Swiss-Prot record:
Pfam families: Ribosomal_S8 (PF00410). Disulfide bonds: none annotated. The lineage of its organism: Eukaryota, Viridiplantae, Streptophyta, Embryophyta, Tracheophyta. One of its GO terms (cellular component) is ribonucleoprotein complex. PANTHER family: 40S RIBOSOMAL PROTEIN S15A. This is Small ribosomal subunit protein uS8c. InterPro entries: Ribosomal_uS8, Ribosomal_uS8_CS, Ribosomal_uS8_sf. Belongs to the universal ribosomal protein uS8 family. One of the primary rRNA binding proteins, it binds directly to 16S rRNA central domain where it helps coordinate assembly of the platform of the 30S subunit. It is found in: Plastid, Chloroplast. Part of the 30S ribosomal subunit. Keywords: Chloroplast, Plastid, Ribonucleoprotein, Ribosomal protein, RNA-binding, rRNA-binding.
Length: 132
């Protein structure tokens, strides 16, 4: 069993982008569902659905590509806060990825949100990952 579900999700998406796969199947947890919803809202993926197989449930992410050469919309994902070294930030010190072109996904007391939402609500939290 994987302990760091967010890192597993990020690695699966990164690997799928390299081989130009259209879908990715990852184990469903509350955290991965919320991160997937954010990726869908921000336009990095086209579809997110939950699939149950026996007693386990999985998330099926449909990745988004552009052009004939199938360039992925997700250029890179980077895990920031890890189980061995948690990284926290208040709302004033949330970093901007590529000058605002990418997003920061945070785990806050209000749930998992993007950097823009956290600044609007003036809440800080644990920086889960960068997406650009």
């Amino acid at each position: 069993m994987v302990n760091d579900t967010v890192a597993n999700m990020i690695t699966s998406i990164r690997n799928a982008n390299v081989i130009e796969a259209t879908t990715v199947r990852i184990p469903a947890t509350n955290t991965t569902k919320d991160v997937g919803k954010i990726l869908l809202q921000e336009g990095f993926i086209t579809n997110l659905r939950e699939h149950k197989e026996n007693t386990r449930s999985f998330l099926i992410l449909t990745l988004k590509y552009r052009g004939r050469k199938k360039k992925p919309y997700i250029t890179n994902l980077k895990r920031i806060s890890k189980p061995g070294l948690r990284i926290y930030s208040n709302h004033r010190e949330i970093p901007k990825v590529l000058g605002g072109m990418g997003i920061v996904i945070l785990s806050t007391s209000s749930g998992i949100v993007t950097d823009r939402e956290a600044r609007q609500k003036q809440i800080g939290g644990e920086i889960l990952c960068y997406v650009w």
